[in-house]
Amino acid sequence: MGNIVRKLPIGIQSFDKLRTENYLYVDKTEFIYQMAYQGVPYFLSRPRRFGKSLLLSTFKAYFEGKKELFRGLAIEKLETEWKEHPVLHFSLNAELYDSRKALENMLERQLREWEKIYDTGGEGITYSGRFMTIIRRAAEITGRKVVVLIDEYDKPLLRNLHNEELQNEFRELLTAFYTVLKDADPWLRFVFITGVTKFAQVGIFSNLNHLNDISLAPQYAALCGMTLPEIEATFQPELHALAEANKLSYEDTIEKITRRYDGYHFDFRSGIALYNPFSVLNVLSKQVFYDYWFASGTPTFLAEMLRKTNYDIRELDGIEVSEVSLSDDRANINNPVPMIYQSGYLTIKSYDERFRLYTLGYPNEEVKYGFLNFVASMYAHLPETETPFYIGKFIQELESGNTEAFLTRLKAFFADIPYELNDRTERHYQVVFYIVFKLLGQFTEAEVRSAQGRADAIVKTPRYIVVFEFKLRGTAEEAIRQIDDRGYLIPYTADEREVVKVGVAFDAATRNLGEWLIEKTL
């Protein structure tokens, strides 16, 4: 195993700490200079753990004139003045926000800290009034315009997505607080606000009509995250050590990192593909391929949203959405797709410029299989740890040609669904079938029907091709006949592997698999 002695910035959100303690850094400072030069108020939406906090910390160091921290970086050759400005840096990331009082306490602590620095005497009755006084006083004392950096502005709202009463209270508080930024414009040099999603009802969007949303802007697509050239330029020793530890070639290592952690697209013109920085740094550090980003946070609010909307998750991979739905109100509980996209579980795959339609899909294997495994536990009401056990056994049985054992285990999987869920609709069971066969795709080639004229599911192993047809209202014999009559086997006539036909009938009374037939072709 390679001996890595360089420091990887896993979880480092302070640019000052990163530079003074010699952590590796993917240089984003050219973006910093460009945005600071423009000077307009910015908003950026990106998924969690994508580098938003470090980005704001970098802006803070830049506007505080800490030139020494930027030695050797792109901005060193661009900036000549290094003017120091008062910076109000505010993160809403650290609280649970389970009550109105929790948000009030957070605002109170932050305002008191600033009031002490700028000696305002706590002037102003409301939070917004005190915030305005702080901005004005900071500009007066220093003789320089103020920089405001707000990190994870939407955290209180995301924490309470399904608590309408608390949501409304938080909106009221935050709208009044953020609206100050419009009236304080004469004293402001730069404003940058980050979050996961865009709550259009909050005042920063309804009142700050000059806020520049760069979330889908091609020129800022690579502002957060890592590109492959950046990874290869910054982490060469770590990449070679990862290859050695996993007994892979350098090329195969890059291919595996790409397959598992690449694939994020935040615009439709630049073609820039981004790697998840959290997963990349972790795999380079631990030298083990694992779903680091997905394991670092469970998308419970998305699961709750899917439950409430009864959304068909089979439509997620390849769904088309309008440009407006991604750039307007993304926190619409009646349409979970924009929120799923903003949270990082879907990404842009293509864009139809004529009709202004985005096609979305899972960015990579980590997200695809992590999300499907999580949703499987939700639909089947099984612990998340049990689904991988089933999938592993399914694969072993199909690879050994024991289709009978596979179907018996699949029946047991359905039997484990609690009895109280047995009033689920037909679609519920179709979705469970879909999830199971999609999850098989982690380990072998598996397809689930997405169009007419194809079998319900096809699994290809080194020795077998297994073609499945399921009948919700019909017999196993009818399912086998449909495989033959519709020519589902024709694409495999020249294949040397053994082809197996499987017809399965669904038993409405037991809400489970009923009879099945297995036929092997000569």
Predicted regions and their residues:
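Phosphate-binding site recognition
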Residues: M1-T425, L440
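Mg2+/Mn2+-dependent nuclease catalytic core
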Residues: Q167-E172, L472-L489
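Metal-dependent nuclease catalytic cores in nucleic-acid-processing enzymes
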Residues: F177-A184, P338-L346, Y434-L439, Q482-V502
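Feature representing long, continuous alpha-helical segments
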Residues: T408, R427, V431-I435, R481
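Conserved catalytic cores of phosphodiester-cleaving nucleases, focusing on short active-site segments
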Residues: F433, A455-L472, R486
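A short acidic/basic microdomain associated with nuclease active sites
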Residues: Y434-S450
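C-terminal amphipathic alpha-helical interaction region
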Residues: E445-A451, A457-T461, Y492
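Domain-level recognition of nuclease-like catalytic cores that cleave nucleotide substrates
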Residues: P491, R497-L522
